[in-house]
Amino acid sequence: MTQKLHIKTWGCQMNEYDSSKMADLLLNTHGLELTDVPEEADVLLLNTCSIREKAQEKVFHQLGRWKELKKQNPSLVIGVGGCVASQEGEHIRSRAPYVDIVFGPQTLHRLPEMINQIRGGKSAVVDVSFPEIEKFDRLPEPRAEGPTAFVSIMEGCNKYCSFCVVPYTRGEEVSRPVDDVLFEIAQLAEQGVREVNLLGQNVNAYRGPTHDGGICSFAELLRLVASIDGIDRLRFTTSHPIEFTDDIIDVYADTPELVSFLHLPVQSGSDRVLNLMKRNHTALEYKSIIRKLKKVRPNIQISSDFIVGFPGETDQDFEDTMNLIAQVNFDMSFSFIYSARPGTPAADMPDDVTEEEKKQRLYLLQQRINNQAAQFSRAMLGTEQRVLVEGPSKKDIMELTGRTETNRIVNFAGTPNMIGKFVDIKITDVYTNSLRGEVVRTEDEMGLRIVQSPQVVINRTRKEDELGVGHYQG
Protein backbone atom coordinates (compact mmCIF):
# COMPACT_ATOMS: atom_id res chain seq x y z
CA MET A 1 0.00 0.00 0.00
CA THR A 2 1.36 3.43 -0.99
CA GLN A 3 2.43 5.59 1.91
CA LYS A 4 1.45 9.25 2.00
CA LEU A 5 3.15 12.53 2.90
CA HIS A 6 1.43 15.76 3.91
CA ILE A 7 3.40 19.03 4.03
CA LYS A 8 1.97 22.27 5.42
CA THR A 9 4.03 25.28 4.36
CA TRP A 10 4.02 28.80 5.76
CA GLY A 11 6.11 31.76 4.69
CA CYS A 12 8.32 32.84 1.83
CA GLN A 13 9.02 31.45 -1.62
CA MET A 14 12.18 29.86 -0.24
CA ASN A 15 10.00 27.77 2.08
CA GLU A 16 7.79 26.79 -0.86
CA TYR A 17 10.92 25.74 -2.75
CA ASP A 18 12.20 23.78 0.26
CA SER A 19 8.86 21.98 0.64
CA SER A 20 8.85 20.94 -3.01
CA LYS A 21 12.36 19.54 -2.56
CA MET A 22 11.28 17.63 0.57
CA ALA A 23 8.42 16.08 -1.38
CA ASP A 24 10.68 15.04 -4.27
CA LEU A 25 13.31 13.69 -1.88
CA LEU A 26 10.91 11.54 0.15
CA LEU A 27 9.20 10.28 -2.99
CA ASN A 28 12.60 9.08 -4.20
CA THR A 29 13.78 7.56 -0.93
CA HIS A 30 10.58 6.31 0.72
CA GLY A 31 7.99 6.28 -2.06
CA LEU A 32 5.91 8.81 -0.12
CA GLU A 33 3.23 10.40 -2.29
CA LEU A 34 1.84 13.83 -1.48
CA THR A 35 -1.67 14.17 -0.11
CA ASP A 36 -3.67 17.26 0.77
CA VAL A 37 -5.47 15.33 3.52
CA PRO A 38 -3.50 15.12 6.81
CA GLU A 39 -5.65 12.20 8.01
CA GLU A 40 -4.33 10.07 5.11
CA ALA A 41 -0.66 10.75 5.82
CA ASP A 42 2.01 8.47 7.24
CA VAL A 43 4.38 11.42 7.57
CA LEU A 44 3.29 14.98 8.50
CA LEU A 45 5.74 17.85 7.97
CA LEU A 46 5.22 21.45 9.05
CA ASN A 47 7.53 23.92 7.27
CA THR A 48 7.41 27.03 9.44
CA CYS A 49 8.08 30.76 9.13
CA SER A 50 9.18 33.04 11.96
CA ILE A 51 8.68 36.41 10.26
CA ARG A 52 5.12 37.12 11.40
CA GLU A 53 3.83 37.92 14.88
CA LYS A 54 3.08 35.00 17.18
CA ALA A 55 4.78 32.57 14.77
CA GLN A 56 5.62 30.14 17.56
CA GLU A 57 2.06 30.02 18.90
CA LYS A 58 0.76 29.40 15.40
CA VAL A 59 3.08 26.39 15.17
CA PHE A 60 1.95 24.86 18.46
CA HIS A 61 -1.68 25.48 17.58
CA GLN A 62 -1.22 23.47 14.38
CA LEU A 63 0.70 20.75 16.20
CA GLY A 64 -2.17 20.48 18.68
CA ARG A 65 -4.43 19.45 15.81
CA TRP A 66 -1.92 16.86 14.64
CA LYS A 67 -1.59 15.48 18.18
CA GLU A 68 -5.05 13.95 17.80
CA LEU A 69 -3.95 12.19 14.60
CA LYS A 70 -0.91 10.81 16.44
CA LYS A 71 -3.20 9.37 19.14
CA GLN A 72 -5.21 7.59 16.47
CA ASN A 73 -2.08 6.38 14.64
CA PRO A 74 0.99 6.01 16.92
CA SER A 75 3.21 5.10 13.94
CA LEU A 76 2.55 8.50 12.36
CA VAL A 77 5.79 10.51 11.99
CA ILE A 78 5.49 14.24 12.74
CA GLY A 79 8.28 16.63 11.76
CA VAL A 80 8.71 20.38 12.21
CA GLY A 81 11.10 22.28 9.94
CA GLY A 82 11.77 25.81 8.76
CA CYS A 83 12.75 28.93 10.64
CA VAL A 84 10.71 28.41 13.83
CA ALA A 85 12.28 24.96 14.14
CA SER A 86 15.71 26.53 13.70
CA GLN A 87 14.94 29.10 16.41
CA GLU A 88 13.24 26.82 18.92
CA GLY A 89 15.07 23.51 18.46
CA GLU A 90 14.58 21.19 21.45
CA HIS A 91 12.00 23.57 22.95
CA ILE A 92 9.48 22.36 20.36
CA ARG A 93 9.64 18.86 21.82
CA SER A 94 9.43 20.12 25.39
CA ARG A 95 6.05 21.69 24.54
CA ALA A 96 4.98 19.05 22.01
CA PRO A 97 6.70 15.75 22.95
CA TYR A 98 4.73 13.88 20.29
CA VAL A 99 6.84 15.60 17.60
CA ASP A 100 9.37 13.08 16.28
CA ILE A 101 11.67 15.25 14.15
CA VAL A 102 12.84 18.86 14.39
CA PHE A 103 14.98 20.04 11.47
CA GLY A 104 16.24 23.36 10.14
CA PRO A 105 16.22 24.81 6.62
CA GLN A 106 19.80 23.59 6.10
CA THR A 107 19.18 19.99 7.21
CA LEU A 108 16.05 19.07 5.25
CA HIS A 109 18.19 16.83 3.02
CA ARG A 110 18.73 14.56 6.04
CA LEU A 111 15.00 13.82 6.37
CA PRO A 112 15.24 10.29 4.92
CA GLU A 113 17.78 9.27 7.57
CA MET A 114 15.78 10.99 10.31
CA ILE A 115 12.60 9.14 9.33
CA ASN A 116 14.51 5.86 9.25
CA GLN A 117 15.85 6.54 12.74
CA ILE A 118 12.35 7.17 14.10
CA ARG A 119 10.96 4.08 12.43
CA GLY A 120 13.94 2.16 13.77
CA GLY A 121 12.92 2.94 17.33
CA LYS A 122 14.66 6.22 18.16
CA SER A 123 12.45 8.45 20.29
CA ALA A 124 13.28 11.76 18.58
CA VAL A 125 15.72 13.48 16.22
CA VAL A 126 16.61 17.18 16.48
CA ASP A 127 19.03 18.62 13.90
CA VAL A 128 18.99 22.38 13.36
CA SER A 129 22.65 22.76 12.44
CA PHE A 130 24.05 24.84 9.55
CA PRO A 131 26.03 22.47 7.28
CA GLU A 132 26.31 25.23 4.66
CA ILE A 133 25.60 24.16 1.08
CA GLU A 134 25.55 20.39 1.71
CA LYS A 135 21.78 20.13 1.27
CA PHE A 136 21.88 21.01 -2.43
CA ASP A 137 24.34 18.20 -3.15
CA ARG A 138 21.91 15.62 -1.77
CA LEU A 139 18.60 16.73 -3.24
CA PRO A 140 17.04 14.91 -6.21
CA GLU A 141 17.13 16.27 -9.75
CA PRO A 142 14.60 19.04 -10.38
CA ARG A 143 11.11 18.24 -11.62
CA ALA A 144 9.20 20.86 -13.57
CA GLU A 145 5.60 21.62 -12.69
CA GLY A 146 4.41 23.99 -15.39
CA PRO A 147 6.30 26.64 -17.36
CA THR A 148 7.69 28.52 -14.33
CA ALA A 149 10.16 27.36 -11.70
CA PHE A 150 12.00 28.62 -8.64
CA VAL A 151 15.70 27.84 -8.25
CA SER A 152 17.59 28.56 -5.04
CA ILE A 153 21.03 30.03 -5.71
CA MET A 154 22.10 30.87 -2.16
CA GLU A 155 21.07 30.63 1.48
CA GLY A 156 21.27 32.91 4.48
CA CYS A 157 22.04 36.58 5.03
CA ASN A 158 24.92 38.56 6.54
CA LYS A 159 23.14 41.90 6.84
CA TYR A 160 21.74 41.53 10.39
CA CYS A 161 18.99 44.14 10.05
CA SER A 162 17.83 44.91 13.58
CA PHE A 163 14.30 43.53 13.04
CA CYS A 164 15.12 40.36 11.12
CA VAL A 165 15.58 36.75 12.27
CA VAL A 166 16.90 35.34 8.97
CA PRO A 167 20.63 35.38 9.85
CA TYR A 168 19.81 33.48 13.04
CA THR A 169 17.45 30.93 11.45
CA ARG A 170 19.04 30.33 8.04
CA GLY A 171 22.65 31.20 8.82
CA GLU A 172 25.07 33.44 6.98
CA GLU A 173 25.29 33.80 3.21
CA VAL A 174 26.42 30.72 1.31
CA SER A 175 26.31 30.61 -2.50
CA ARG A 176 25.80 27.49 -4.59
CA PRO A 177 28.51 26.72 -7.17
CA VAL A 178 27.60 28.30 -10.50
CA ASP A 179 27.78 24.95 -12.33
CA ASP A 180 25.18 23.44 -9.97
CA VAL A 181 22.79 26.33 -10.60
CA LEU A 182 23.19 26.18 -14.38
CA PHE A 183 22.81 22.40 -14.41
CA GLU A 184 19.53 22.59 -12.48
CA ILE A 185 18.14 25.33 -14.73
CA ALA A 186 19.18 23.52 -17.92
CA GLN A 187 17.40 20.39 -16.68
CA LEU A 188 14.27 22.45 -16.04
CA ALA A 189 14.51 24.03 -19.50
CA GLU A 190 14.69 20.54 -21.00
CA GLN A 191 11.39 19.81 -19.22
CA GLY A 192 9.69 22.86 -20.71
CA VAL A 193 10.30 25.58 -18.11
CA ARG A 194 10.32 29.03 -19.73
CA GLU A 195 10.56 31.34 -16.70
CA VAL A 196 12.99 30.99 -13.81
CA ASN A 197 12.90 32.91 -10.53
CA LEU A 198 16.28 32.85 -8.76
CA LEU A 199 15.80 32.64 -4.99
CA GLY A 200 17.79 33.71 -1.98
CA GLN A 201 17.45 35.80 1.14
CA ASN A 202 19.83 38.26 -0.52
CA VAL A 203 20.36 37.11 -4.11
CA ASN A 204 22.47 40.02 -5.27
CA ALA A 205 25.11 38.99 -2.73
CA TYR A 206 25.60 35.80 -4.78
CA ARG A 207 29.26 34.86 -5.19
CA GLY A 208 29.25 31.36 -6.67
CA PRO A 209 32.43 29.28 -6.86
CA THR A 210 33.47 28.30 -10.40
CA HIS A 211 35.17 25.08 -11.53
CA ASP A 212 38.56 26.80 -11.81
CA GLY A 213 38.59 28.36 -8.35
CA GLY A 214 37.15 31.70 -9.40
CA ILE A 215 34.00 33.50 -8.31
CA CYS A 216 30.91 34.16 -10.42
CA SER A 217 29.11 37.40 -9.57
CA PHE A 218 25.34 37.74 -9.56
CA ALA A 219 25.46 39.84 -12.73
CA GLU A 220 27.49 37.15 -14.50
CA LEU A 221 25.08 34.45 -13.32
CA LEU A 222 22.10 36.38 -14.70
CA ARG A 223 23.69 36.51 -18.15
CA LEU A 224 24.61 32.81 -18.04
CA VAL A 225 21.07 31.77 -17.10
CA ALA A 226 19.53 34.05 -19.72
CA SER A 227 21.72 32.46 -22.40
CA ILE A 228 20.10 29.03 -21.96
CA ASP A 229 17.68 28.42 -24.82
CA GLY A 230 14.10 28.15 -23.57
CA ILE A 231 14.65 30.39 -20.55
CA ASP A 232 13.07 33.49 -22.02
CA ARG A 233 11.98 35.16 -18.81
CA LEU A 234 14.18 35.65 -15.76
CA ARG A 235 13.32 37.00 -12.30
CA PHE A 236 15.01 37.08 -8.91
CA THR A 237 14.02 37.70 -5.30
CA THR A 238 14.91 39.04 -2.81
CA SER A 239 17.55 41.79 -3.07
CA HIS A 240 19.21 44.25 -0.72
CA PRO A 241 19.84 47.83 -1.88
CA ILE A 242 23.41 48.02 -0.58
CA GLU A 243 24.47 45.25 -2.97
CA PHE A 244 22.46 46.39 -5.97
CA THR A 245 25.61 47.33 -7.86
CA ASP A 246 26.06 48.98 -11.25
CA ASP A 247 27.07 45.70 -12.91
CA ILE A 248 23.59 44.34 -12.11
CA ILE A 249 22.01 47.44 -13.62
CA ASP A 250 24.12 46.83 -16.74
CA VAL A 251 22.41 43.44 -17.14
CA TYR A 252 19.07 45.24 -17.44
CA ALA A 253 20.59 47.20 -20.32
CA ASP A 254 21.76 44.20 -22.38
CA THR A 255 19.73 41.12 -21.33
CA PRO A 256 16.17 41.09 -22.69
CA GLU A 257 15.20 37.95 -20.77
CA LEU A 258 15.50 39.82 -17.45
CA VAL A 259 12.02 41.17 -16.71
CA SER A 260 11.20 44.86 -16.36
CA PHE A 261 10.00 44.27 -12.83
CA LEU A 262 12.05 44.37 -9.65
CA HIS A 263 11.27 43.62 -6.02
CA LEU A 264 13.71 45.72 -3.98
CA PRO A 265 12.82 46.01 -0.27
CA VAL A 266 13.34 49.42 1.34
CA GLN A 267 11.28 49.01 4.57
CA SER A 268 11.07 52.76 5.29
CA GLY A 269 11.54 56.13 3.61
CA SER A 270 12.95 57.74 6.75
CA ASP A 271 16.73 57.86 7.09
CA ARG A 272 16.37 57.92 10.87
CA VAL A 273 14.30 54.73 10.86
CA LEU A 274 16.55 53.09 8.26
CA ASN A 275 19.45 53.74 10.63
CA LEU A 276 17.55 52.17 13.54
CA MET A 277 16.79 49.20 11.30
CA LYS A 278 20.52 48.88 10.46
CA ARG A 279 19.76 48.92 6.74
CA ASN A 280 23.04 50.72 5.97
CA HIS A 281 21.63 52.92 3.21
CA THR A 282 19.62 56.12 2.93
CA ALA A 283 16.40 56.87 1.09
CA LEU A 284 18.41 58.95 -1.38
CA GLU A 285 20.74 56.04 -2.13
CA TYR A 286 17.71 53.83 -2.74
CA LYS A 287 16.21 56.39 -5.12
CA SER A 288 19.57 56.61 -6.92
CA ILE A 289 19.39 52.89 -7.72
CA ILE A 290 15.87 53.28 -9.10
CA ARG A 291 16.92 56.30 -11.16
CA LYS A 292 19.79 54.33 -12.74
CA LEU A 293 17.47 51.40 -13.47
CA LYS A 294 14.89 53.62 -15.14
CA LYS A 295 17.61 55.13 -17.31
CA VAL A 296 18.28 51.74 -18.93
CA ARG A 297 14.72 50.37 -18.52
CA PRO A 298 12.31 53.34 -18.63
CA ASN A 299 9.24 51.12 -18.15
CA ILE A 300 10.56 49.06 -15.24
CA GLN A 301 8.08 48.66 -12.37
CA ILE A 302 9.19 48.38 -8.76
CA SER A 303 7.74 46.57 -5.77
CA SER A 304 9.02 46.69 -2.21
CA ASP A 305 8.63 45.68 1.43
CA PHE A 306 7.56 48.14 4.12
CA ILE A 307 7.37 47.92 7.90
CA VAL A 308 5.10 50.49 9.57
CA GLY A 309 5.17 51.35 13.25
CA PHE A 310 8.83 50.44 13.81
CA PRO A 311 9.97 51.44 17.34
CA GLY A 312 10.37 55.20 17.46
CA GLU A 313 8.65 55.87 14.12
CA THR A 314 7.15 59.38 14.24
CA ASP A 315 4.50 60.99 12.07
CA GLN A 316 7.31 62.69 10.12
CA ASP A 317 9.10 59.37 9.60
CA PHE A 318 5.92 57.89 8.19
CA GLU A 319 5.41 60.96 5.99
CA ASP A 320 8.94 60.42 4.63
CA THR A 321 7.93 56.86 3.72
CA MET A 322 4.79 58.08 1.95
CA ASN A 323 6.87 60.62 0.03
CA LEU A 324 9.28 57.90 -1.08
CA ILE A 325 6.34 55.77 -2.25
CA ALA A 326 5.08 58.64 -4.39
CA GLN A 327 8.53 59.50 -5.76
CA VAL A 328 9.44 55.94 -6.74
CA ASN A 329 5.84 55.19 -7.80
CA PHE A 330 5.83 51.61 -6.54
CA ASP A 331 3.59 49.16 -8.36
CA MET A 332 3.00 46.86 -5.39
CA SER A 333 4.27 46.07 -1.92
CA PHE A 334 4.41 43.57 0.90
CA SER A 335 3.66 45.81 3.87
CA PHE A 336 3.27 44.86 7.51
CA ILE A 337 2.77 46.26 10.97
CA TYR A 338 5.95 45.92 13.02
CA SER A 339 6.01 43.16 15.59
CA ALA A 340 9.10 42.23 17.60
CA ARG A 341 10.92 39.03 16.71
CA PRO A 342 12.52 37.36 19.75
CA GLY A 343 16.30 37.49 19.74
CA THR A 344 16.63 40.48 17.40
CA PRO A 345 18.11 43.85 18.49
CA ALA A 346 14.85 45.63 17.67
CA ALA A 347 13.04 43.43 20.20
CA ASP A 348 14.88 45.35 22.95
CA MET A 349 13.66 48.73 21.66
CA PRO A 350 10.54 50.27 23.23
CA ASP A 351 7.55 49.46 21.00
CA ASP A 352 6.15 52.96 21.42
CA VAL A 353 3.84 53.31 18.41
CA THR A 354 0.25 52.54 19.39
CA GLU A 355 -1.60 49.71 17.69
CA GLU A 356 -4.15 52.19 16.37
CA GLU A 357 -1.42 54.34 14.81
CA LYS A 358 0.16 51.28 13.21
CA LYS A 359 -3.13 50.17 11.68
CA GLN A 360 -3.91 53.64 10.36
CA ARG A 361 -0.46 54.01 8.80
CA LEU A 362 -0.67 50.59 7.19
CA TYR A 363 -4.08 51.45 5.73
CA LEU A 364 -2.82 54.74 4.26
CA LEU A 365 0.32 53.12 2.84
CA GLN A 366 -1.52 50.23 1.21
CA GLN A 367 -4.19 52.56 -0.16
CA ARG A 368 -1.50 54.74 -1.79
CA ILE A 369 0.26 51.78 -3.41
CA ASN A 370 -3.02 50.17 -4.52
CA ASN A 371 -3.96 53.43 -6.24
CA GLN A 372 -0.60 53.54 -7.99
CA ALA A 373 -0.96 49.90 -9.08
CA ALA A 374 -4.42 50.64 -10.49
CA GLN A 375 -2.93 53.47 -12.54
CA PHE A 376 -0.29 51.11 -13.95
CA SER A 377 -3.01 48.62 -14.89
CA ARG A 378 -5.18 51.25 -16.56
CA ALA A 379 -2.16 52.43 -18.56
CA MET A 380 -1.92 48.93 -20.08
CA LEU A 381 -5.28 49.31 -21.83
CA GLY A 382 -4.70 49.13 -25.57
CA THR A 383 -1.06 48.07 -25.22
CA GLU A 384 0.54 44.77 -26.24
CA GLN A 385 1.83 42.64 -23.38
CA ARG A 386 3.92 39.48 -23.61
CA VAL A 387 2.25 36.75 -21.57
CA LEU A 388 3.55 33.34 -20.49
CA VAL A 389 0.55 31.02 -20.75
CA GLU A 390 0.09 28.94 -17.59
CA GLY A 391 -3.10 26.99 -18.34
CA PRO A 392 -6.89 27.23 -18.35
CA SER A 393 -8.43 30.29 -16.73
CA LYS A 394 -9.95 29.84 -13.28
CA LYS A 395 -12.81 32.14 -14.29
CA ASP A 396 -13.66 30.35 -17.54
CA ILE A 397 -12.18 26.95 -18.42
CA MET A 398 -12.81 27.70 -22.09
CA GLU A 399 -10.20 30.48 -21.85
CA LEU A 400 -6.50 30.55 -21.02
CA THR A 401 -4.61 32.54 -18.41
CA GLY A 402 -1.05 33.75 -18.05
CA ARG A 403 1.09 36.49 -16.58
CA THR A 404 2.82 39.56 -17.91
CA GLU A 405 6.40 40.26 -16.91
CA THR A 406 4.98 42.63 -14.27
CA ASN A 407 3.07 39.67 -12.79
CA ARG A 408 -0.40 40.75 -13.89
CA ILE A 409 -2.89 37.99 -14.66
CA VAL A 410 -4.29 38.11 -18.20
CA ASN A 411 -7.26 36.01 -19.38
CA PHE A 412 -7.87 35.49 -23.09
CA ALA A 413 -9.33 33.17 -25.71
CA GLY A 414 -6.71 30.75 -26.99
CA THR A 415 -5.89 27.17 -27.94
CA PRO A 416 -4.39 24.41 -25.75
CA ASN A 417 -1.14 24.34 -27.76
CA MET A 418 -0.37 27.82 -26.39
CA ILE A 419 0.04 26.51 -22.81
CA GLY A 420 3.66 26.75 -21.71
CA LYS A 421 4.49 29.23 -24.45
CA PHE A 422 4.55 32.99 -24.88
CA VAL A 423 1.88 34.99 -26.67
CA ASP A 424 1.54 38.72 -27.24
CA ILE A 425 -1.82 40.01 -26.03
CA LYS A 426 -3.53 43.30 -26.78
CA ILE A 427 -5.18 44.41 -23.54
CA THR A 428 -8.87 45.17 -24.07
CA ASP A 429 -10.22 45.28 -20.50
CA VAL A 430 -8.78 46.20 -17.11
CA TYR A 431 -10.23 44.78 -13.88
CA THR A 432 -9.23 45.12 -10.23
CA ASN A 433 -7.20 41.91 -10.08
CA SER A 434 -6.72 40.92 -13.71
CA LEU A 435 -6.60 42.00 -17.34
CA ARG A 436 -8.31 40.69 -20.44
CA GLY A 437 -7.10 40.72 -24.02
CA GLU A 438 -6.80 39.23 -27.48
CA VAL A 439 -3.91 37.27 -29.00
CA VAL A 440 -2.04 39.29 -31.62
CA ARG A 441 1.13 37.20 -31.94
CA THR A 442 2.19 33.65 -31.11
CA GLU A 443 5.65 32.51 -30.05
CA ASP A 444 6.59 31.33 -33.54
CA GLU A 445 6.35 34.93 -34.72
CA MET A 446 8.51 36.45 -31.96
CA GLY A 447 12.08 35.55 -32.90
CA LEU A 448 13.13 34.83 -29.32
CA ARG A 449 16.88 34.81 -28.67
CA ILE A 450 18.72 31.47 -28.94
CA VAL A 451 22.25 31.24 -27.50
CA GLN A 452 22.88 27.69 -26.28
CA SER A 453 20.65 24.69 -25.88
CA PRO A 454 19.91 23.20 -22.45
CA GLN A 455 21.55 19.94 -23.52
CA VAL A 456 24.81 21.73 -24.28
CA VAL A 457 24.78 23.20 -20.76
CA ILE A 458 23.88 19.82 -19.23
CA ASN A 459 26.69 18.06 -21.08
CA ARG A 460 29.15 20.77 -20.08
CA THR A 461 28.17 20.79 -16.41
CA ARG A 462 27.90 17.03 -15.87
CA LYS A 463 31.57 16.77 -14.92
CA GLU A 464 31.58 15.16 -11.49
CA ASP A 465 34.42 15.06 -8.99
CA GLU A 466 35.07 12.27 -6.49
CA LEU A 467 32.21 13.56 -4.31
CA GLY A 468 29.77 13.38 -7.22
CA VAL A 469 29.55 17.16 -7.53
CA GLY A 470 29.31 18.58 -11.05
CA HIS A 471 31.63 21.35 -12.24
CA TYR A 472 30.95 23.92 -14.93
CA GLN A 473 33.57 23.67 -17.64
CA GLY A 474 32.74 27.01 -19.33
UniProtKB/Swiss-Prot annotation:
SMART domains: Elp3
UniProt binding sites for [4Fe-4S] cluster 1: C12, C49, C83
Enzyme Commission number(s) of this protein: 2.8.4.3
All copies of domain TRAM, residue ranges: 378-441
Keyword S-adenosyl-L-methionine tagged: yes
GO MF annotations in UniProt: 4 iron, 4 sulfur cluster binding; metal ion binding; N6-isopentenyladenosine methylthiotransferase activity
Cofactor: [4Fe-4S] cluster
Binding site for [4Fe-4S] cluster 2: C157, C161, C164
Catalytic activity: N(6)-dimethylallyladenosine(37) in tRNA + (sulfur carrier)-SH + AH2 + 2 S-adenosyl-L-methionine = 2-methylsulfanyl-N(6)-dimethylallyladenosine(37) in tRNA + (sulfur carrier)-H + 5'-deoxyadenosine + L-methionine + A + S-adenosyl-L-homocysteine + 2 H(+)
Subcellular location as annotated: Cytoplasm
PROSITE patterns registered for this protein in UniProt: MTTASE_N, MTTASE_RADICAL, RADICAL_SAM, TRAM
Residue ranges crossing the lipid bilayer per the database entry: none
Cofactor detail note: Binds 2 [4Fe-4S] clusters. One cluster is coordinated with 3 cysteines and an exchangeable S-adenosyl-L-methionine.
Domain MTTase N-terminal: 3-120
CC terms in the record's Gene Ontology section: cytosol
Subunit-level organization: Monomer.
Function comment: Catalyzes the methylthiolation of N6-(dimethylallyl)adenosine (i(6)A), leading to the formation of 2-methylthio-N6-(dimethylallyl)adenosine (ms(2)i(6)A) at position 37 in tRNAs that read codons beginning with uridine.
Protein name listed in UniProt: tRNA-2-methylthio-N(6)-dimethylallyladenosine synthase
Gene: miaB
